Design a protein with these regions (language model features):
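Short S/T/G/P-rich N-terminal loop/turn motif that feeds into the first structured element of a domain
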Residues: 1-33, 37-38, 47-48, 67-71, ...
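Conserved residues at the C-terminal ends of beta-strands
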Residues: 42
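Hydrophobic/aromatic-rich structural module bridging two neighboring secondary-structure elements via a short loop
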Residues: 45-90
Length: 209
């Protein structure tokens, strides 16, 4: 499993309806993408949920490196780069995955529609992402084990992942939630406009080594 994200920070007065329309028009294109565990189409809006910026920040869990490479070198990412400029792409090695109670009713395709889904909608509606730099004296394996043990057990949890960027020794905790994210969960908060999850069911839960 490989985690991946790019962040496109937009002007303070940017009409985020443009991003919503883009996702509404194109989000379904990855609903059956080979090698993709999930893609969460995420946004942050200035002044909401503590965000200082407007941002489009899709997050991916790839089941295969071939799928990730096919996307990055293919027309989808090429089109995004043409529209917004080529963003820096962050990449973490997957260390573990938890599938929550709120993810059990999904259909296996893109379940969350565009816009802020209501309480009865299928799929997650919010996400959290926390990154932590591991101290030089820390044992990376122990830190990952602790992060896996600390994955939230919450009825609103859809999916949670732990991953590591060994070039920076940075630990990533990412979670998707149905409804508002719990207040005690740290990290940046996002709204989910759409979820594509073609091969999420093929990603093993638990530790990934």
């Amino acid at each position: 499993m490989h985690a991946m994200q790019y962040e496109i920070t937009l002007p303070a007065d940017y009409d985020m309806g443009i991003i919503r329309k883009r996702v509404a028009d194109k989000g379904h294109l990855l609903d059956t993408y080979p090698g993709l565990g999930l893609k969460a189409y995420l946004i942050r809006e200035r002044g909401l949920d503590g965000s200082p910026v407007n941002q489009y920040a899709p997050f991916y869990l790839w089941r295969t490196p071939q799928g990730m490479n096919s996307f990055l070198w293919g027309p989808g990412f090429r089109g995004l780069s043409a529209d917004f400029g080529r963003p820096a792409v962050r990449h973490w090695l997957g260390a573990g995955l938890a599938l929550g109670e709120a993810g059990g009713g999904d259909t296996g395709r893109g379940d969350t529609g565009p816009g802020e889904a209501g309480p009865g909608a299928e799929g997650p509606t919010t996400a959290t992402r926390e990154t932590v730099r591991l101290p030089e004296a820390a044992d990376p394996a122990e830190a990952v084990e602790q992060a896996l043990a600390g994955l939230p057990a919450h009825p609103a949890l859809h999916t949670a992942a732990v991953a590591v960027d060994p070039s920076r020794w940075e630990l990533l905790r990412f979670a998707l939630w149905r409804g508002p994210a719990p207040e005690d969960v740290p990290g940046a908060r996002y709204r989910v406009l759409h979820l594509s999850r073609p091969e999420l069911d093929r990603l093993p839960a638990g530790r990934h080594w």
